[in-house]
From Swiss-Prot:
Membrane topology classification: Multi-pass membrane protein
Gene: nuoN
Enzyme class: translocase
Subcellular location: Cell inner membrane
Family per record: Belongs to the complex I subunit 2 family.
Protein name: NADH-quinone oxidoreductase subunit N
Length: 520
């Protein structure tokens, strides 16, 4: 009976991941199934991709409902504590599913223009999302590695999924080679931590570190290598060099998926490992992470200034946003992690909306859109120019017109300044970096509204699906920018501990992520 009870608890804890992976496998089977073994024609294959993308969106909604029910019912993690059942996991899962659903909608919109994607692509996105959800709940380094590899292997393929494009193939090779190196750092760091502590569970690692008078060089070497591997996954400088080339070469829907959803999952596991698992070692890793955040904010924004290629500009912008999110991890308390959740919601909406506009103006061409392509957009598609302005101002953090983007940065600044150990200098760097970002974001706005439309430039045409995605993302950013309380309240509930500190070994100011009860 105890074994049956344990099996039931494990099934309940992993039900969302099982639903998503099972649905992904069914869609994969549907992508290759043909009646009586007949090979589908090109038109049938193209239509099948669109249909499977729609089923993928429905699957994300179903799994999202399962996550909401699990959160509301107080579903716990696995009995051995290797998978969390806390609000942080469920909140991040919902953001991941939101990003995946929007990316699938972008995929269909792009596919209707270029017919560049095979019917297996929606399944690959869903499998990658399964790995991301594993990362969101992982409390064991082996589960972390399992989630990273499941996510990464699918995304490597997605980057090169347009087999008619040499740029896409180049992006896939670069991402695979550099991703394999980063996974080596990650795995070697985990091995050293296991060698030092005798366990891969975050709770055991924390308890071991708390019992030591001094932390061994073996342990700290493992922490350093783990930090390098995670920094690559979130595209933090100087481990960001792959980002512009891969984003530029990958298909636009895949780039949006990588920029928003992959980053959300990577930061979720980054936060859980550093705040929950390695909090005792914070005095040793804090300064390294501090410099990583500062350099990332500066490098991302400075290199974005000279870009005319809009995808490369957004790639460097995403590097800068990684720096902002690192500040929330450095803060290391409930305010910081709740600000992180709010930020990734805002960033996901703005990124998906912005790439929806880029897909529209690019018209299915095998190249990244430039400033010339978006010039004079106000003259031919005013609503697209207005929506793109909302997304860019959200990235910048402009009050009111930037919607949620302003409060996303405000909450991180507030957490940094009100932390037990205030991060005043980092807050100043964040403000200055955001001011620098205004130059390249407003350059795009200026091109849309102030420059004439180049002769011979086609008028962008949109599909109803892409129109609805862009409009929904823009309206959501504006509405929750005027009334951010519901999202922020959910983020606070997701990251508030049930006691003043559920990790007695953590240093002052460190709050362990919620472990059992669900917010009421």
């Amino acid at each position: 009976m105890p074994d049956a009870m344990s099996a039931g608890a494990i099934l309940r804890a992993l039900l969302p991941e099982m639903l998503l992976s099972g649905g992904a496998m069914l869609l994969l089977l549907a992508s290759v199934w043909t009646p009586q073994g007949n090979q589908p024609g090109a038109a049938e294959g193209a239509e099948r991709t669109s249909v499977l993308a729609r089923f993928g969106v429905i699957l994300c909604l179903v799994v999202g409902l399962a996550v909401v029910i699990a959160w509301g019912d107080g579903a716990a993690g696995t009995p051995d504590g290797r998978v969390a059942g806390d609000g942080f996991r469920w909140a991040v899962d919902l953001v991941i599913l939101l990003g995946t659903a929007l990316a699938l909608m972008l995929l269909e919109a792009e596919h209707q223009r270029s017919a560049a994607f095979g019917p297996e692509v929606p399944s690959l996105m869903l499998l990658a999302s399964t790995g991301m959800m594993v990362l969101a709940g992982a409390r064991d380094l082996m589960f972390v590695f399992l989630g990273v590899e499941l996510m990464s292997l699918a995304v490597y393929v997605l980057a090169g999924v347009n087999r008619r494009s040499a740029r896409s193939a180049e992006a896939a090779v670069k991402y695979f080679l550099l991703g394999a190196i980063s996974s080596g750092f990650l795995l070697y760091g985990m091995a050293l931590l296991f060698g030092a502590t005798g366990s891969t569970r975050l709770q055991d690692i924390t308890e071991w570190a708390a019992a030591q008078a001094t932390l061994s060089p073996l342990f700290m070497s493992g922490v350093a290598l783990l930090l390098v591997g995670l920094a690559f996954k979130v595209a933090a400088a100087p481990f960001h060099l792959w980002t512009p080339d891969v984003y530029d070469g990958a298909p636009l829907p895949v780039t949006a998926f990588m920029s928003a959803t992959v980053k959300t999952a990577a930061f979720a596991v980054f936060a859980r490992i550093m705040i929950e698992g390695l909090a005792v070692a914070a005095p040793r890793w804090h300064m390294g992470l501090w410099w990583l955040a500062a350099v990332t904010m500066v490098v991302g924004n400075v290199f974005a200034l000279s870009q005319r290629n809009l995808v490369r500009m957004l790639a460097y912008s995403s590097i800068a946003h990684a720096g902002y999110l690192l500040v929330s991890i450095i803060v290391g308390d409930a305010a910081g992690t709740s600000a992180l959740i709010f930020y990734v919601v805002s960033y996901t909406l703005a990124t998906m909306g912005a790439f929806g506009v880029l897909i529209t103006i690019n018209g299915g061409r095998d190249r990244a859109p430039t400033l010339d392509d978006i010039a004079g957009l106000w003259l031919v598609r005013p609503w697209l120019a207005i929506a793109m302005t909302v997304f860019l101002l959200a990235f910048m953090g402009m009050p009111v017109l930037g919607g949620m983007g302003f409060f996303a940065k405000w909450y991180i600044l507030q957490a940094a300044l009100q932390a037990p150990a205030p991060q005043t200098i980092l807050a100043v760097v964040l403000v200055i970096a955001s001011a620098v970002s205004a130059a390249y974001y407003l350059a795009v706005v200026s091109a849309m509204f102030m420059r004439p439309r180049p002769e011979g430039q086609p008028v962008p045409s949109t599909t109803p699906l892409n129109q609805s995605l862009i409009a929904t993302a823009a309206v959501a950013l504006l509405v929750f920018g005027l009334y951010p309380t519901p999202i922020m309240e959910l983020a606070r509930r997701a990251t508030t501990t049930t006691s003043p500190t559920s990790n007695p070994a953590a240093p002052r100011g460190e709050v362990r992520l919620q472990t059992a009860s669900v917010p009421r």
